[in-house]
């Protein structure tokens, strides 16, 4: 009777061990993965959906302005001396409107951003502060004419003197709120013969920074009004229901699956990555070396490079940051050659130096982007200034902390600086003596950091996953112990063959009877 129970115990233990091994190696990971996918995919029933549709907390949007402190000296050929003023802090609210779902596991949506000035975070700074900055819109206009039709530069400049009020030099004295959102009024009601040409061009194809005035006689120039309370897109994004590894990937923008701003090159024109709000979980066995995001403001995808695994908010995370390769010159990174656009400037082939990006193909204006204070850019850019430019990795780099299990952004900062060339043009009185160089206007810092409530939710999820992991290995351990105990019991009861102690003979215990004969081999 005991032998029968022992054999049964052994059989059950062996089956339990096999089942436990399958569960530990495949079952539990599959169940957990499916549950995570169910929670984070873009679906009306998922936990993530509403947080994705309407971000539950505001992002930070900080603006730093480069105030010019020696205007008269610069007008006479001296190096510019700059003073950084900021941050002018804003709360940025984001809300998406779902337009529909595609058969290929996609969702189409528009994104609306709303900016509200945050006086507390801005400290003593006010939107009514007056600053002196490079006249971005004037320089954009005169550079475009000078590059495309240099012979009429002087004539067009005469029209611009009526278009822009008090145009005595290439600098703008302006209130911060007008520069950012409210707008600086420019006039189309003058009588200069070339003014109709300038305003006609704007009416037909105005850049994003110019919006028509209500009186019909002019425009308002501002850096960010086109982003405020207006819907961008539509975007088409993969929902992650069929393949969680593709979650968040942007496959089209404004109906285009390829950005032709950079020609027909597949590398520069492809849409790669997410909109930086959502990422797929990270496979710990195959951690991506680059994290791509699609940036509509520059009409291209950018990437941050993996630095390593880190810890933030007492949780493990993968840390990515912008590296020098992303904005490298074509000599340092030949892959960036397709971002050169020869047709926009008569002065060079469009291949800019290290650390800066030509925005002309994207914005139809000769603007140039960089990291703040020309961080990771060529040092020759710094030599143009008499002070006020001091690149610092901690203050000026772009980075992101990504939680691997869910792909949630724990913390991230995107930093970008807008620049334009200040060019010496002898035929233009306002530019006849100025030194030529790349001049910064301002830089932005857009950031997200999860609130405590969501961090607690993540920690609870991690705790639950820890319990599941403990159960997974506990069941396997119990099955191993039970199988070992039952195997020993079976062996001791004589139900399985054993090797005898006598090295010169082999015996087989065929039954549990103690008086069984032992056959000896001589």
Swiss-Prot record:
InterPro entries reported in the protein's UniProt record: CD36_fam
Q: Which residues are on the Cytoplasmic side of the membrane?
A: 1-7, 491-522
- Is Cell membrane tagged as a keyword? yes
Per the record, ranges on the Extracellular side are 29-469
Q: Which residues are glycosylated?
A: 44, 67, 104, 166, 191, 228, 272, 314, 343
Native species of this protein?
Ostrinia furnacalis (Asian corn borer)
Its primary localisation, in coarse terms, equals: membrane
Single Gene Ontology BP annotation = sensory perception of smell
* Molecular function in Gene Ontology: scavenger receptor activity
Q: Does the keyword Transmembrane helix apply?
A: yes
What's the protein called, per UniProt? Sensory neuron membrane protein 2
As for membrane topology, the entry says: Multi-pass membrane protein
Superkingdom of origin:
Eukaryota
Q: Name one GO cellular component term.
A: plasma membrane
Which keywords accompany this UniProt record?
A: Cell membrane, Disulfide bond, Glycoprotein, Membrane, Olfaction, Receptor, Sensory transduction, Transmembrane, Transmembrane helix
Q: What does the record give as the function of this protein?
A: Plays an olfactory role that is not restricted to pheromone sensitivity.
Tissue distribution: Detected in both male and female antennal tissues. Expression is two to three fold higher in male compared to female antenna. Detected at low levels in all body tissues except the female abdomen.
Q: Which family does it belong to?
A: Belongs to the CD36 family.
The record's annotation in Pfam families points to: CD36 (PF01130)
Instruction: Spell out the subcellular localization from the entry.
Output: Cell membrane
What residue intervals traverse the membrane?
Answer: 8-28, 470-490
Task: Give start-end ranges for the coiled-coil region(s).
Answer: none
Cystine connections: 268-338, 299-362, 340-351
